From Swiss-Prot:
The lineage of its organism: Bacteria, Bacillati, Bacillota, Bacilli, Bacillales. Belongs to the peptidase M16 family. Binds 1 zinc ion per subunit. It holds the Pfam family Peptidase_M16_C. Its EC number is 3.4.24.-. This is Uncharacterized zinc protease YmfH. One of its GO terms (biological process) is proteolysis.
Amino acid sequence: MIKPIEYEQLQETLYHEKMSNGLDVYVLPKKGFNKTYAVFTTKYGSIDNRFVPLGKNEMVHVPDGIAHFLEHKLFEKADGDVFQDFSKQGASANAFTSFTRTAYLFSSTSNVERNLETLIDFVQDPYFTEKTVEKEKGIIGQEINMYDDNPDWRLYFGVIENMYKEHPVRIDIAGTVESISHITKDLLYECYETFYHPSNMLLFIVGPVDPEAIISQVRENQGKKPYTDQPEIKREEVKEQEAVFRKEKEIKMNVQGPKCLVGLKSKNPFKLGKELLKHELSMNLLLEALFGKSSAQYESLYEKGYIDETFSFDFTAEYGFGFAAIGGDTPEPDQLAEDISSMLLRAGELITAEKIELARKKKIGTFLKALNSPEYIANQFTRYAFLDMSLFDVVTVLEQITLEDVQNVIQEEIAADRLTVCKVVPKS
């Protein structure tokens, strides 16, 4: 049964149906768009390295980087590469692995039905051989080495490694050359069978499409496939300390000038649904009010020459981990880290209702503009859905957040023992 969900304020109607095999399908028709985006996502990412495989009773520990490895391998079939099928059908295809999910997507202005069929079928039909797995190790090994030479990537993961002692978020998404050497065809099938069941997946389509036609096409496609019900996936719950693992780290690299990131580790990252949405948006308003371009703090850091246009801040919230990262290129990494840390610790007195109001207007404006991008909607929708939130509730919740809500977030989140600094400095 197709269920329309109305979002009157945004004038959007979302169509949803849960297939008999458990697959959630969502369609967002956009009349004025010429491009259609479809994203097929599994709730399986780099942090899912300890779990009970389908049909077994014991927890296993799989090699780091296997989710990303599997993403690469799914595109390869006995008779060639799926990327070529998409391009013959006038579509551009892509995929990515994050900490918590793996997504496969295409965008096209024509042949939407054929491309959608190709997307669903290739993801639901794995083909792994020992030979192709061995070959892929070399390719992904090169990718890993490339990231190892990227100072911004090393800085970002450096700050995460500083924060987390036990949680697998501290492991690079692609793993290491050593860890992927242990990946086998059988391990890939074991991960695939466990995490790529339709009941652990979501298909989202946005564009100038007819929701009834799309959903019945998916229904027909899924009806032909012999899926059986699957028990809930058991993942290991990691015990992680509240305080950061390391207060500071310096990485020497071939860079022109230093880079610095201050990390703030979330205290209680086990929120979902409306509670998480309110928390995340309150945190975003706080960071915008504290460090946005129109803030006194930004001006002071800029005038001292500590920051330039690379300065950025963001807050990542998932189930089981969460953190803010603030910084950029700087000639004075120590002073910048000290200033950012002290601004965070003084946030309670630096924030006013007026500053929150300005931040709110900016955030709502940016969000409404982003809703004109099918790519943005497609990539964000699933993340929200997997955390029991809705992308289309963002404006409503932003409008409701008060100064008191932001002060509560400051009380909960900001403490000296949850702050850490990572620096990348030139080899001298």
